[in-house]
Amino acid sequence: MADRPVVAVTGPDGRYPIAWGATRLAVFLAGGTAVRLTPSNFREHQKERFQAIIIGGGSDIDAELYGGENTEHSRIDLERDLFETEMIGHALDTNLPILGICRGAQLINVVLGGSLFSDIRLLREQTSNRRTPFPRKTAIAESNGVLLDAIDSDQWRINSLHYQAIDRLGEGLKVVARDLDSLVQGVESISHRWLVGVQWHPEYLIYLKRQRRIFRHLVCRAREGAAESLKLPED
């Protein structure tokens, strides 16, 4: 469809991960068209224009980027860190709608001057550290905002596939949701047109209406601001 906003979805190099397929479907169901961007292929898309961007999940963020220390469990993809940092900067400069998923939310926080917990497993007291794509954990609303407008509930079920989490909040962000251990589960910008970061993976939960609504809100904002599209920088 000609009126489908084009949404850039960042991810790692290599084979197509399951997360990309799930995110692509979520964007399609929301009325948009997803285009996969990686550190090695983004030059192929430099002539395209995007109306929104999703910073996807995946490997851990290099702790050196926020003054922390990596652990023995850290899986670092520095090339991706640097590529997505640049993409976030351009999206912020052009006021493009941004959704950060899991590591994407964490990286947005780091780009804005915040820090992360490198390993949250010792911080959990109320919930387990079991990683699962199924909605086995609970997020609780902390403040109103665009995420709560999308979720339309003060409590909802989430999945958990992470060891890192937001610690010190980045400039211009506010916390809008936490889990039962008070770890940050949702952030958004207090000034950007539409910037939301979620610590869970809504792309794996699109069989739940509340999770689909996150992508629908992103695509709606992209369509409203289609004139403010992002063209990737030339070399």
Residue ranges of model-derived segments:
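Active-site-proximal beta-strand elements of phosphoester/diester hydrolases
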Residues: L195-Q199
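The feature captures the ABC ATPase H-loop/switch
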Residues: A105
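N-terminal beta1-alpha1 cap of cysteine-dependent amidohydrolase-like domains
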Residues: M1-I101, N109-V111, F117, R121-I151, ...
